[in-house]
Structures are given as C-alpha cells and as structure tokens.
Amino acid sequence: MAAVAVAVREDSGSGMKAELSARPGAGGKEMTQEEKLQLRKEKKQQKKKRKEEKGTDVDTASAVSAAQCPGPAREAPGPGSQSSTPGEKVPAGRTKAELRAERRAKQEAERALKQARKGEQGGPPPQASPSTAGEAPAGGKRLTEHTQADDPTLLRRLVRKSERQQVPTRKDYGSKVSLFSHLPQYSRQNSLTQYMSIPSSVIHPAMVRLGLQYSQGLISGSNARCIALLRALQQVIQDYTTPPNEELSRDLVNKLKPYICFLTQCRPLSASMYNAIKFLNKEITGVSSTKREEEAKAELQAAADRYVQEKIVLAAQAILRFASKKISNGDVILVYGCSSLVSRILQEAWSEGRKFRVVVVDSRPRLEGRHMLRFLVRAGVPASYLLIPAASYVLPEVSKVLLGAHALLANGSVMSRVGTAQLALVARAHNVPVLVCCETYKFCERVQTDAFVSNELDDPDDLQCERGDHVALANWQSHPSLRLLNLVYDVTPPELVDLVITELGMIPCSSVPVVLRVKSSDQ
C-alpha cells in the first residue's frame, strides 16, 4: 500500500497554504473516498493558483473572448471575484447577492463593448428597447375600432370604402376641442340625404328613414335604438330577393354592409346594436343553402323577434323582480336622466304598494330627466327635479342611487350618459350605494378606462341657450378661439358601482368577463 505523503508548502505570492496529495503507485490499492475528495480539492486549488498568478492578463483575455463569443458571457474569477464552483466558499464580508450583481454588471459591460465594436464595423449599434408582453410588434398594424377623424390616411380609406358601397359620408362641422379631435363631429345641419337620390340609391328606404331618426334624435336610448334597428332589418329581409347563382347566406350579409355603414355615418352604433347585428349575421350565415328563400326569410324574421323578446322584454321583466327587492318603504331614490328600464322599475315598485320618493337629476342640453319626471308624475310617484350641479346638496338624504347604462365594458366600467361618473363619485363621498340596471345584451368585450379614446360628439349647436329673443352662443363659429364640446357618454370606474342588476341576477362589476365568457360559450 502506497503511503499518502502530505506536503505542506507555502505560496510566496499569496501566503496561502495548500495541501498536496501524492497519487498512489500503480501497484497499490485503490484510493479511498476521502483520498479522492482530497485529490479533487487539490486540483481546484492548483487551478485557482495558476489563474491568480496570471493576474490582470487573465481578466483582459476573458473580457475579449466574452465579447467575441455569441453565447452568454462567462466570467473568469480573479482575486476579487467568486468562482462558480460549488466547493468554494463565499468570501467574508460579501454576500452572494452582491457577487451576482457584480457579475451581472460585468456581463452588461462586456455586451456594451461588443455592441460598440459592431457599431464601429458596420454602422450604429441597434438601440435596445425593453419589450413588454402587452406591446405589439413594430411591424404590426394597430386595428382601431373607430375611425380616427384626425388621421388623413384613415379618412381617405373610409371615403373610398363609402364610395364603393355608394354611401354618403358626413363632413365635419365646426372646430373641435383638441383633446377630442380624433372623434367625428356630428351636426344636424349637415344632412346626409341632401344630395341622395332615394330611387337610385342602394340604401333601403327603411334604413334611410331609421338613419334620419337617429341623427335627429327622434329615437334615443339603447333599447329603443336596438329595437328600431331590428325592425328595419326585418323590413329589409322581407324585401330581399336572392340574385341568380347566389346564396342567401352570403349575399344578404354583403347587402347589409352598406346599410350598417350608412347608419354609422348618421350616428355611431351603440354596443347593444353591435351585438344585435352580430347575432343576426350569425343567423344569416347559418341558413342552409337547400332551404327555400321564403322559409329562410321567415326564420330570420322570427329570430329577430325572438332576440327582442328574450334579450330586451323578458330581460327587463327579470330585472324588475330583482330590483324591486332593493326598494323599501321610506327610501329616497336618486335617478339620472331618463332610462326606460329604471322608469319601469320605479313604476312597478310603486304599483306593488311600496312608499318611496324619487329625486330626478337632469343636465343640459338634452334634459332627458323631464321625460322621467313626466312618467313618474303620471304614475303618482312623489318626485322632485333638479339639475346636476345641485346633486351634492340632496345626497345626504338619499338612500340609494339607481342608474341605467349604455354599455358595460369587459373591465367592469359602466358607459352611460355624461354626468353619470360625477354622480357616482359624489354618491361614494356620501356613502350612498350606487346600483346600475343593465341587460346582459349590452355587455361588450371592449375595454375602456376613460371617455377620451372612444366616445360620441353630439351637435355643438345644442349648447346654445335661448333666453327670450336672445340666443347665447348664436355666432360661436365666428370666433376662431371658441370651441364647443357636447360629449354624449362618460365612463364610470367599477370601484364606484356597488351592484349591477341584470336578468341573471345581482352581480358585481368584476363578474362582467364571466358573463361574456358564458355567453360566448352558449353561442
């Protein structure tokens, strides 16, 4: 058995002691486990000593090789750095986190050196920009839901599309506030049908009549607009005839596109109208090619009737039952504007014998609250009327706020008549619960956190105030520095809404994505 001679030598360069083990002879027995570990440790120490003797030359060579290597840079341990071998201990006074940060900084410096050398050889180095998961690729197109009225390229594209479909385009009216310059400005003075020849137009007369009613404000409210749209589409389907060598499921969808474009030019479509059009298009594309035309048209008209009955009429009845449970005797209920659903809820609760009082809050220029006040007075409900600047003075005596909704967005925000967010904010300051009544067919997958990106600009001339023979702001367009803003909707964050009452039940705003997911799976 060969003896293991242990020699201790002192290194003159570092003052460190290393234990060197002699290998066993060829004729000796096999080394034990302790001897193998000792030999392995000896090799590591020798390797470290050789690198320390090289000193600065080793560090420079490693930096150059790391800059030329395409893979991740590896660091050569020097006197002040820690080796990555597991058998080595962390130097005293320095933590592992500090050493990792030091190595990371050195790697970044080596990458910068590499980029600088590339720039010297072939132009400027590419600028590194932090990429996030939510950003779109640089070469990708950003699809906008609404046409940007201040983008000439998109406007030219819209004009060409309207010309192909033989649909007149609306011209902008007056000067707009710069913050909302991307939204189209609507005016009742610019008529779309002024130069339209009805007999030679591709637009169905029922759709022309509907578009004019939208633009003049004769039909307003999400439910009323959606029902009127489906009735007009039923008339279009009734008068439709499938051309030769065409299928109804394909040709009818193409026929409806210019009609929808015309309605959008008259007034932007609501979320409820988008969902109704999506439903009808799906029903049309599902028509079998072997089915007779009259039978297919009858089925499509029945589908439109079923949509109105289930999504609007029956949904309103279910909401009435849920909302009536939230109205108690002695309540003081604040409502805003005129929501047909809220009006029915209050009248139904009063007819059931509950005694309460209603405060109707209104705002210019539409003054829709007057219609709500008229409905309540006819039903015998005690009501008071005030404008929105005075709402904070009556909220201390209000027990709950009952509001309607134009749409419920996927992030839980409520899109409703402008001023709703202000009322919800003041109600939260007075600890008054805010209840929103909304059918689920108004839920949409759009996400919006403010009222600036997507909204509707109504006629600015509606802001003119008549006082006897004097009309305030009569010649506002003659002043180039004056701009009028008649915003239609605002967005209320979900934090200000306590409960949403739907036909499915009473849910929080955070449950809107769940309802959308269930609806998409059912379809």
From Swiss-Prot:
Protein name per the record = Translation initiation factor eIF2B subunit delta
Annotated region described as Disordered, given as residue ranges: 1-154
Activity control summary: Activated by the chemical integrated stress response (ISR) inhibitor ISRIB which stimulates guanine nucleotide exchange factor activity for both phosphorylated and unphosphorylated eIF2.
| Organism whose genome encodes this protein | Oryctolagus cuniculus (Rabbit)
GO MF entry, a single one: translation initiation factor activity
Biased segments, Basic and acidic residues type? 31-40, 95-120
Q: Which domain of life is it from?
A: Eukaryota
Q: Which InterPro entries match?
A: IF-2B-related, IF_2B-like_C, NagB/RpiA_transferase-like
List residues, modification Phosphothreonine.
Answer: 85
Basic residues bias (residue ranges)? 41-51
Q: Where is this region: May bind the chemical integrated stress response (ISR) inhibitor ISRIB?
A: 170-179
Name which cysteines form disulfide bonds: none
Q: Which GO terms describe its cellular component?
A: cytoplasm; cytosol; eukaryotic translation initiation factor 2B complex
Tell me where in this chain the PTM N-acetylalanine is found.
2
For the keyword Isomerase, the answer is no
| Key words, A-Z | Acetylation, Cytoplasm, Initiation factor, Phosphoprotein, Protein biosynthesis
Q: Which residues carry this modification: Phosphoserine?
A: 12, 129
Q: Which family does it belong to?
A: Belongs to the eIF-2B alpha/beta/delta subunits family.
| Subunit details | Component of the translation initiation factor 2B (eIF2B) complex which is a heterodecamer of two sets of five different subunits: alpha, beta, gamma, delta and epsilon. Subunits alpha, beta and delta comprise a regulatory subcomplex and subunits epsilon and gamma comprise a catalytic subcomplex. Within the complex, the hexameric regulatory complex resides at the center, with the two heterodimeric catalytic subcomplexes bound on opposite sides.
Purpose:
Acts as a component of the translation initiation factor 2B (eIF2B) complex, which catalyzes the exchange of GDP for GTP on eukaryotic initiation factor 2 (eIF2) gamma subunit. Its guanine nucleotide exchange factor activity is repressed when bound to eIF2 complex phosphorylated on the alpha subunit, thereby limiting the amount of methionyl-initiator methionine tRNA available to the ribosome and consequently global translation is repressed.
Q: Which cell locations does it reside in?
A: Cytoplasm, Cytosol
A GO BP entry is: translational initiation
